[in-house]
Amino acid sequence: MSSKVQAVLLLVGVITFLAVHAQEELSENTESERSCARLYERCSMTRRPCCNNVPYVCSLLGTYCECKKGLIQTVGDFIGI
């Protein structure tokens, strides 16, 4: 087998390996992003916490919780702090 054919086969093998590895990492990232609730989404204290340590507000009975920024965070974002 010529050296050019070997080089092409090696290159195809490396590209295939890198593509599979990159796809596995991407699926891990999306799975971890799904495991937390974004701002103004429904959350749960134990099963689905808020992303980025955003605080949550629950109903009086604790049956409905939602990720919301507090007043200080909202003012800080408005001012740009």
UniProtKB/Swiss-Prot annotation:
UniProt comment concerning the protein's domains: The presence of a 'disulfide through disulfide knot' structurally defines this protein as a knottin.
Gene Ontology molecular function, alphabetical: ion channel inhibitor activity; toxin activity
Disulfide feature: 36-51, 50-67, 58-65
Subcellular location: Secreted
Organism: Lycosa singoriensis
InterPro entries (UniProt xref): Spidertoxin
Pfam families: Toxin_9
Propeptide residue span(s): 23-34
GO cellular component terms, A-Z: extracellular region
Protein name, as recorded: U17-lycotoxin-Ls1a
Keyword Transport: no
SUPFAM superfamilies in alphabetical order: omega toxin-like
Tissues and organs where the protein is expressed, per its UniProt entry: Expressed by the venom gland.
Family affiliation: Belongs to the neurotoxin 02 (plectoxin) family.
Cleavable signal peptide: 1-22
This protein's UniProt keywords: Disulfide bond, Knottin, Secreted, Signal, Toxin
